[in-house]
Design a protein with these regions (language model features):
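Family-specific signature for flavin-dependent thymidylate synthase
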Residues: 1-252
């Protein structure tokens, strides 16, 4: 899973608008310096109080926007697509571009697939001839089959001495329905801090690695303590998370 080209914007306007109900704009102390936002003590304190007061009081969170390019397997995108409100996504199309390049093992998420070097007796299928067949073998054969159909789609197929039309839809269907859900797709995604808080609350301990990686990416965003607080973490847990992020950045 990859996160690229992360951009966060809207802090200054959102935190100024946060003060509209009480008309306390004179206390607004958030500034932009060299393209970076520095939230002042007054604004940060009010934001934290509004977050603790509940979602109906923290509307400013919906006005802080995040744009990012995410590469992840289709099985994760299927779950991500349940978040319809407050998200926009443009994806690389498997419908239109599935035959654009040859399929390779690197195009799939395979970190948990068992291979012959590490499987026990009950983790592979054995053919009558004695050949052992692991999940990784199955994916490799599927990739070979996908590339075979891709070649037929691009170059056409001879049938009864005649060249069947190239880019035939029947051939295209073979690739579409054979494509495993571990295939990685890239999307440009637009979210906001309120959506991220809801995701963080429900997914931070999810059994899918991709959701936990997503939540770690959230923790690295500017002023992510606002998201984590809205997501249900207490101050001690937030400080521990932020400390881990700072330590990681020092190592990098």
């Amino acid at each position: 899973m990859k996160f690229e080209n992360t951009e966060v914007y809207g802090f200054k306007r959102a935190l100024k608008g946060m003060r509209n109900p009480l008309e306390s704009w004179h206390k607004n102390d958030t500034v932009e310096e060299n393209g970076k936002v520095v939230i002042g003590e007054n604004d940060l304190g009010l934001a934290q109080r509004l977050i603790k007061a509940g979602s109906e009081h923290r509307k400013f969170m919906r006005q802080i926007f995040v744009s990012v390019d995410i590469t992840a397997p289709l099985y994760w995108w299927k779950e991500f697509d349940t978040y319809k409100v407050g998200t926009v996504a443009n994806s690389c199309s498997t419908m239109h571009k599935i035959a654009e390049k040859e399929f390779a093992l690197e195009d799939f998420s395979t970190e948990h697939l068992q291979d012959c070097e590490c499987v026990s007796e009950d983790e592979f299928y054995e053919f009558p001839c004695g050949r052992r067949y692991t999940p990784m073998d199955s994916l490799v054969d599927t990739i070979k089959m996908l590339n075979k159909w891709r070649d037929l789609y691009i170059n056409g197929v001879h049938c009864g001495g005649c060249l069947k039309i190239r880019q035939d839809k029947d051939i295209w269907w073979q690739m579409i329905q054979l494509l495993p859900s571990s295939y990685n797709q890239t999307r440009n995604v637009m979210l906001n801090y309120e959506v991220l808080a809801n995701i963080y609350k429900s997914r931070k301990n999810h059994k899918l690695d991709e959701w936990r990686e997503f939540c770690k990416w959230i923790e690295e965003l500017p002023y992510s303590e606002l998201i984590m607080s809205a997501g249900g973490l207490d101050d001690n847990s937030i400080n521990a998370k932020l400390g881990a992020v700072r330590h990681l950045k020092k190592q990098i």
